């Protein structure tokens, strides 16, 4: 279901599950396993996640819903999805979602779990679960609220109407919108810029930003001071400062 292509320190993870790249349980399981492998691979510093075919992902596999008979089973399905979305968001290496076609329901929940989002201008992004008489279950209510604010999040969920990629940028849901034919190249360019930085520094910033969700400002500021001290004495920091003084491009090794 997933294929991997590597370009330098960037791993391009493509989902291929036609026709709509639905997020079946087997897809989420494989995604988790792929992330485990990337975490241990020093040659992977940044990951791009995108969908093959017409869509990024049109959502959860509705056929799996028909096998659910109890409230407890449904809640367990939601918790399993939430766990993988949290794993994506807490992943120590940057994950960029490259979104074309549609990111709907679980597809948008997955995209929102990624750290950055590049979208095709004409892509459709939404949480249409209420159209089925249900609600988002993979933490979509919370992440959409975080990105676009209460009023827009409620509007999108209550109406089930998606927004375009261009609108997603305007609402803070995506970083950049480009013509679809430029999507993957734009994501690669961004990924390569990040991959050129010290992976130690990149991961430290990601850790601090993630901790801000659950800790106080002063706790995070203290953690920032601690990590500043740890990063400052690394070989990468010495290389970066030396390269600046010598007016050359630094070569970071992640040490």
Task: Show the residue positions of the predicted features.
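Short C-terminal tail/terminal secondary-structure segment
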Residues: 249-255
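Crotonase-fold acyl-CoA enzyme core
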Residues: 87-200, 230-234, 239-242, 248
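A short acidic, glycine-rich active-site loop
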Residues: 67-79
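Charged catalytic carboxylate motif
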Residues: 26-30, 80, 87, 186, ...
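A structural preference for short, pocket-lining loop segments at secondary-structure junctions
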Residues: 8-16, 29-69, 86-98, 116, ...
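Extreme N-terminal starter segment of soluble prokaryotic enzymes
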Residues: 1-3, 10
